[in-house]
């Protein structure tokens, strides 16, 4: 049975909820929460490597939101005029979840330490002496001299009574912030362009939005009292929370047994190709157990099945005598799958995107000529939100290119490739989160490293390698989550509660700026107050590992092998076939998202 081609259908309009307004007092309270959460999360990630914003249902945002809901219920009883509405509660969740990872792996954990490391590890005592600083404009780092207090005190104990050298950061942070904010804006605009298509036409599930929607109650009663009175709810809560609670207590009190929710199968096969199935992950993630109930059967099956298929592929390679380059093979397989998936998303939405382009041209005509010709037979165009987002995408993309060319002095061709890589990976990750609700997920490859592997240091050049890596410390490098996953969920929540996508997007961008400014103060302060050797285990070696990675690309050549290219070909063909079968046969049991998510 042939499925109707999604691209041939016109836009489907769903009646939106009544437009709601958020009071300025609620907005101010939300931004205060943003600043507080960012500062606390930044300190926690540097000193203990506890990432409070991890996951597209951020691990610390959900309990904080639940606490706000309960307090708001009490306020509604005693002073209803001061209570928050349901839309305002959801607004708080949208904004907090959108900035949750800014102070973690998404940006701040890497940016400040790595900027310092580029200078410190260019010193004579390092194996990378003078490898990085000749390529760095002086206004992009606190200092180019490793003996300067702004660099040295970060790695060695600051003299007693000395003032924190925060003033040395003013110029580099002033120069970097427009670029960093532009990266987030670019990610947000691409989500804004596709949100209406995914929500109203393709009707994606957005499983993760169900949690805040249920916790926020209803418009009449913004506190889910029926939920808290449910025995089934509390049984599920205990089953989910108990293993983690015992695990946390065990770390402080070893006499308490450790349930070890993350285990592996150990060695199942001592030798031969089947060793690829050793150390199978046997992880208990209660959040994904719950989310799985909200997924379609083919998505759930694919997320479970494809990890075994991946290991089977490695076993087949070993059986054919190929015992090396498994990681490279799978990585390039993922790169190809991402490209094919992104192309398919554009193809399926081509009719919708044509309408947006027409609306954008009409909007431009209004701006340039102050009038637009109308006829009675004019085809209704989409609301201008998507047109504004498209214009914003073009404007921000151009501004980022200008920054790279005239501020960072990076070649435009490589910058264009880097930013296109961000758009492709961000779009695919947003789709995975919107359709499959995966709790923690980011691309299994780094865009800039793929560029370095494909084109090599001789073609790209040392200066471009150093600066492109530095430009990738926001969004283009995340190893846990990407902002687009948070953004699509927040835009969906804005639609569900009647706030509107454009309003939601505007305040998300404001909140990102607030979070970034707080990070600019928090992270250098914590780094100098503790010094790198006294930070968390991860922070102690982060900048050194980055310096080693860049140094290796500067000093060694990594030519591509047939393993890379065969991985690319097989990945593209497999992803295309899965997409074709999904579009051609209703009920086909395998979903390309399973292939995208688990390979690599």
What spans do the regions from the language model cover?
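Ordered core of a single globular domain
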Residues: 402-404, 485-512, 516-522, 574-588, ...
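Transmembrane-helix bundle segments that line or gate the permeation/cavity pathway
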Residues: 2, 23-473, 477-483, 518-544, ...
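Extended non-catalytic scaffolding segments
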Residues: 547-568
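Short, Lys/Arg-rich, polar N-terminal cytosolic tail immediately upstream
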Residues: 1-19
